[in-house]
Swiss-Prot record:
EC number: 3.6.5.-
Gene Ontology molecular function: any one: GTP binding
Domain OBG-type G: 160-328
Gene Ontology biological process terms, A to Z: ribosome biogenesis
Top EC class of this enzyme: hydrolase
Species whose genome carries this gene: Synechococcus sp. (strain CC9902)
Name of protein: GTPase Obg
Disulfide-bonded cysteines: none
InterPro entries, A to Z: G_OBG (IPR031167), GTP-bd (IPR006073), GTP-bd_Obg/CgtA (IPR014100), GTP1_OBG_dom (IPR006169), GTP1_OBG_dom_sf (IPR036726), OBG_GTPase (IPR045086), P-loop_NTPase (IPR027417)
Cofactor(s) required for function per UniProt: Mg(2+)
Self-association state and partner proteins as the record states: Monomer.
CC terms in the record's Gene Ontology section: cytoplasm
Length: 329
């Protein structure tokens, strides 16, 4: 399935039905009064979070969503049928913003959460409303009102508690694959991961925690370089980051600094998010050299650094213990 995490749509509420001018025409009622009914209200357009959806792909080709119009009123003060509500399903974690102003209108996180994206117009009034002592046979009625019409920006931000970050080829996809049932594409070249991968890792209690493998960052990602803003947004909701550094890199300390700089440049509090610094691919470093690499990273970051091999399955239980401790589970 193609992963689409941004979409622009237009929503239009249904137009209200017109009221009508009508008069009672019944036997034995020679001077029947006004009986024009009101128009039905236009239908609303509603966005609803659905846990079965994982992408905004449905909005790639369909951009305009319009609810039904209300029907005109009828004689004998009959109100017209209101337009049906149009419900649009979106993935949980979808933010809804006004396209031109950028104002946040809603954040649909929990399944079933709803947001009215365009209200339908009110129905017009029939002439029965205009009966008065001065005017016993009013002809006046009003037309229905147009529904609202809004241009919207939808942005999907994945609902993962733990985000795995690092430069391309740091081993993020391998780690999420061995910790969970996720099966991301894995190969030995940069940018193998072009979409975020989600995996569920079981806690000691048996409950699941969602991990997200975020596509590799590069220098300038916060300004849009590489995969840039397209995927940095997906770690905004995480409670904890696992920052992987490739032990086989020519300069692990510089790799660390690049990612930290991008987190700082992007903002949204990411650089201050709780983070575990992890040296991966320990099998690529001589045992005698490993303490020096770890010390360099600890001095540069001011953090404790753990050491694993995702490919070999080394020290993964210790890593998970650190994760659960940070999450308080």
């Amino acid at each position: 399935m193609q992963f689409i995490d941004q979409a622009r749509i237009s929503t239009r509420g249904g137009r209200g039905g017109d009221g009508i001018a009508a008069f009672r025409r019944e036997k034995y009622v020679p001077a029947g009064g006004p009986s024009g009914g009101d128009g039905g209200h236009g239908g609303h357009v509603v966005l609803e979070a659905d846990s079965n959806l994982q992408t905004l792909l449905d909005f790639k080709y369909k951009r305009l969503f319009a609810a039904d119009d209300g029907k005109r009123g009828g004689p004998n003060k009959r109100t017209g049928v209101s337009g049906r509500e149009l419900v649009i399903k979106v993935p949980c974690g979808t933010e809804v913003r006004h396209l031109t102003t950028g104002i946040l209108l809603g954040d649909l996180i929990e399944p079933g959460t709803r947001l009215v994206a365009a209200f339908g117009g009110r129905g017009g009034l029939g002439n029965a409303h205009y009966l008065s002592n001065r005017n016993r046979a009013p002809e006046k009625f009003t037309e229905g009102r147009d529904g609202e019409e809004w241009p919207l920006q939808l942005e999907l931000k994945l609902l993962a508690e733990v985000g795995i970050i690092g430069l391309p080829n740091a081993g993020k996809s391998t780690l999420i694959a061995v910790l969970s049932a996720a099966r991301p594409k894995i190969a030995d070249y940069p940018f193998t991961t072009l979409i975020p991968n989600l995996g569920v890792v079981r806690r000691p209690s048996g409950d699941g925690t969602v991990f997200a493998d975020i596509p590799g960052l590069i220098a300038g990602a916060a300004q849009g370089a590489g995969l840039g803003h397209d995927f940095l947004r997906h770690i905004e909701r995480t409670r904890l980051l696992i920052h992987l550094v490739d032990a086989g890199s020519d300069d692990p300390v510089e790799d660390l600094r690049v990612v930290e700089q991008e987190l700082k440049a992007y903002g949204h509090g990411l650089v201050d998010r709780p983070r575990l610094l992890v040296l991966n691919k320990k099998e690529l470093v001589q045992e005698s050299d490993l303490p020096g690499v770890l010390a360099d990273l600890e001095n540069a970051s001011g953090r404790d650094v753990s050491c694993i091999s995702a490919a070999m399955g080394t020290n993964l239980n210790e890593l998970l213990e650190n994760v659960w401790n940070e999450l308080g589970v």
